[in-house]
Structure formats: C-alpha cells, structure tokens
Amino acid sequence: MQTLSSAPDPAVSVAVTILAVLLALTGFGLWTAFGPKATKLTDPWDDHDD
C-alpha cells in the first residue's frame, strides 16, 4: 500500500506527463484555430481558383 510520502510508480509519472503534453497540444490547437489570431488564417483551397 502506498502512502502519500512514498515515491509514485514510474508508470504513473509517464502517463501523467503524456496526458499533460496531449492536453497542452490540444489547447494550443484550439487557441490557434479559434483564438484572436484566427481571423488572419486563410484557406488555401479558397484562395486558389482553377
């Protein structure tokens, strides 16, 4: 049984790190897509007429 003073399992540390990175990337993607600079984004398919 683990107590709060014992070291956590390395697998838990790796899982929390991966989860934090994925959440950060998701947040950055949403901020890029819908944030204040999103008005400057253009769609290259709409800009190119054939």
UniProtKB/Swiss-Prot annotation:
Membrane topology value: Single-pass membrane protein
Protein's cellular compartments: Cellular thylakoid membrane
Alphabetically ordered keywords of this record: Membrane, Thylakoid, Transmembrane, Transmembrane helix
Spans traversing the lipid bilayer: 14-34
Classification via HAMAP family: PSII_PsbN
Family, as annotated: Belongs to the PsbN family.
Listed name of the protein: Protein PsbN
Organism: Prochlorococcus marinus (strain MIT 9515)
